[in-house]
Amino acid sequence: EEIFSEQATALYEAGVDLLVCETMTNLTEARAALLAARNTGLPVIVTFTIDKNGRTMSGARLLPCVITLQSLGAAAVGLNCSEGVTAMAKPLAEALPHAAVPLVAKPNAMDSQGELSPLRFGQEMQMLLDAGAVIVGGCCGTTPEHIAVLRGAVDNHPLVVPREIDINAVAVESEAFFIDDNIEFCEPIPCDSDLAQRLIEAEDCSNVALLQISCQGDVDNLIEFGGMSRLPIALHTDNAVLLDDALHRFTGRLIV
C-alpha cells in the first residue's frame, strides 16, 4: 500500500484529474492500490486483467471484486487488457445486476487469431456495451482508428445508467455471497492455527461462518486463511482496533 501511495501522491501533486489502477492481477493488490489512491481525494478507477475463463491470475472473478471495491469507494470497476473482447462479456454481464458504480471495459485489440481491425474491434465491442460496460476504451494494439470506430459504436448505443441497488452482499476473492433473512451463524470460531479446517467444518451446520477476533494473531490468521472460506464470513469482536485492522486487510467484504 505504501508503494501505491507514493505513486498516487506524485500524480496528484502533478495535477491529474483521476487515478486509474489497471491490469490488476488479484484483489489484494487492487484493494491496496485503491486504499492508497483514494487518500488523494481523486476519483479512482480499478480494472483487472482476466484469462479466457474469466478469472485473474489469483483465481478472482469480477463480481466479488466489484462488490468489494465499490464498497471501498471506487469510482468505477472493470476489466482491461485480458484475452481480448469476448473474454470480458460474461464477467461484465454477471457483475452488472450488482454494480452500484460504472463498469469499465478496455480490451486488447486482438483475439486468438491475431490483431483486430478497427472495424472488427468496434463490432465486437458491441458485446461489451450490451453486457453493461459504460466506460470503454482499448488496451494493447489499439490505435486512434480503433478508438474512432469505438466512438461511433458508443454514440449509437443506449447508455446504461448505474442504479441504486440493495447490496446485501459479501465476498472473498473467488466468490460472492448474497445475504437474505435466512442467516444461520455457526458457533463462534476462534481464529487460531486450525482456522482453515474449522471453516470447512462450518459448511455442514450453517450458512455464515462467525469468526471470533480476540488478539492480533487472530487477525493475522483471518487474513491468511479467511480467503479459503466457501461461506460468507462474519466477525465478532469487542476490540475496535482489531476490527479496523481486519477490515482494512481482509481481501473481500465482511459482515460485522
Task: Give, region by region, the residue ranges found by the protein language model.
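Domain-level signal for soluble alpha/beta catalytic cores
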Residues: 1-256
